[in-house]
């Protein structure tokens, strides 16, 4: 099933990074990134901020502002003031040669008298004009402007991206987030606005931030292979979690109790990327919910493994946690989608969506769902996303994904991927990947391809994200973000 690209945004971001050890170039904040992600540093930063702010009478005409006090966003400013009557706050950042950036400041109520927020969007090595506007319930407003000259970025990433192709469609007011470059040098999370201008540079310890999740106005994100940070709306780190002997890999979600469920590698094992763990965000306790070897023991034993190397026999790369305590996993190594029931209490295999030929002669053929229609089952897929739809029957739902359309299994050298006509088997010669959307019917045990379109080839990683709700692809009223 091939369809024209239509209402799709494809970002191919190639950012050359030549970054130093990880010391802020701005003289106001010369601290190592490792130190930032300690509670000692954050508590001292909060104390310094409160002491500097003191008990001053801060109004719209006398705003207290401090550049990046918690060192978590090099393009940010802490802002505090009061208005004589309840107001909502917006701000605009202007700098010569760059489009303006306007945002609404966070506050607990739409209109209130006390205003404390993190302003983002400053342009480095530039005198920024910051305009803050208070709008009152009666529709009247007041504005003030001030200038701030920001120093350099910590990294050497592009401030302004070049648009190589695309339509003139309005993209709305949002930020596109790159969750980490996984480089040998300093790693970052970048946020670009719809004009392709960098508005947030967030240093992390290393690896990448796989997701940004929000709970109770707190942002949770991984900042290294073993650590998670909980960051409030001011940019202050409120909590740092250590995952012990587990490495976070690719994905995490909140469960129904507000705790975090991770895909992980247990460093005490000889295999990788095959565990699911839970982090209790209150007690900090880390527990293992599932080792996939327990459910796929005979399959693992049938795979190839070079002594002394890590055994990447399953390589799970996506986690979707459902309200009934089941999880949907994407396995790159088997090019399969796997649903596990009761992951927190008594895990069991529900179904597998994958090539029947790949799973034949194993103990797991009974779990395979039946393909309905003539299409190529996904290969090496990523970001498999669960999507409900009120128009569907109970037991039916959609799964959409970035289908890499790449057939390769390092631990299954006995399997010839070329038997699947159309699948790419060469990293350098591959031509086409896809956006795929399946209709899954648990009542019938089937899956059907209901939507797809071609995208540039990417053998590994990459992602697809629909913006616009459950119906968006079906009714063509949303944007799909493809990140290669």
Residue positions per predicted region:
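Membrane-proximal envelope biogenesis segments
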Residues: 14-18, 24-25, 47, 129
């Amino acid at each position: 099933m091939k369809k024209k690209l239509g209402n799709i945004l494809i970002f191919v971001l190639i950012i050359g990074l030549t970054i130093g050890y990880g010391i802020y170039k701005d003289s106001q904040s010369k601290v190592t990134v490792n130190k930032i992600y300690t509670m000692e540093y954050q508590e001292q930063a909060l104390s310094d901020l409160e002491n500097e702010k003191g008990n001053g009478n801060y109004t719209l005409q006398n705003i207290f502002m401090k550049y990046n006090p918690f060192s978590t966003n090099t393009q940010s400013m802490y802002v505090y003031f009061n208005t004589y009557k309840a107001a909502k706050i917006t701000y605009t950042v202007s700098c010569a040669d760059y489009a303006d950036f306007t945002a609404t400041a966070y506050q607990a109520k739409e209109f209130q008298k006390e205003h404390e927020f993190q302003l983002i969007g400053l342009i480095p090595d530039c005198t920024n004009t910051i305009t803050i506007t208070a709008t009152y319930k009666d529709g009247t407003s007041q504005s003030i402007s001030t200038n701030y000259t920001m120093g350099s970025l910590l990294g050497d990433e592009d401030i302004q991206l070049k648009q190589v192709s695309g339509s003139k469609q309005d993209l709305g007011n949002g930020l596109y987030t790159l969750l980490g470059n996984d480089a040998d040098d300093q790693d970052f999370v970048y946020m670009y606005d719809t004009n392709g201008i960098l508005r947030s540079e967030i240093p992390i310890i290393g690896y990448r931030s796989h997701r940004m999740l929000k709970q109770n106005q707190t942002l949770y994100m991984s900042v290294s292979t073993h650590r998670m940070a909980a960051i409030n709306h001011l940019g202050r780190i409120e909590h740092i979690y250590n995952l012990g002997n587990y490495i976070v890999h690719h994905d995490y979600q909140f469960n129904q109790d507000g705790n975090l469920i991770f895909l992980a590698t247990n460093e005490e094992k000889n295999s990788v990327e095959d565990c699911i763990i839970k982090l209790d965000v209150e007690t900090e306790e880390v527990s293992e919910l599932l080792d996939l070897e327990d459910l796929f023991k005979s399959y693992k034993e049938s795979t190839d493994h070079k002594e002394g190397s890590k055994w990447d026999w399953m390589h799970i790369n996506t986690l979707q946690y459902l309200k009934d305590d089941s999880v949907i996993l994407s396995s790159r190594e088997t090019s399969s989608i796997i649903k596990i029931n009761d992951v927190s209490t008594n895990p069991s295999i529900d179904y597998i969506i994958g090539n029947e030929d790949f799973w034949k002669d194993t103990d797991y053929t009974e779990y395979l769902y039946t393909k309905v229609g003539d299409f190529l089952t996904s290969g090496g897929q990523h970001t498999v996303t669960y999507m409900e739809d009120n128009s569907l029957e109970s037991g039916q739902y959609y799964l959409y994904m970035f289908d890499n359309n790449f057939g390769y299994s390092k631990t299954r050298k006995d399997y010839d991927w070329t038997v699947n006509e159309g699948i790419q088997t060469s990293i350098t010669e591959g031509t086409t990947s896809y956006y795929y959307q399946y209709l899954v019917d648990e009542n019938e045990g089937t899956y059907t391809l209901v939507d797809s379109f071609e995208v540039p080839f990417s053998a590994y990683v990459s992602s697809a994200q629909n913006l616009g709700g459950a119906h968006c692809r079906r009714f063509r009223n949303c944007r799909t973000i493809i990140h290669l």
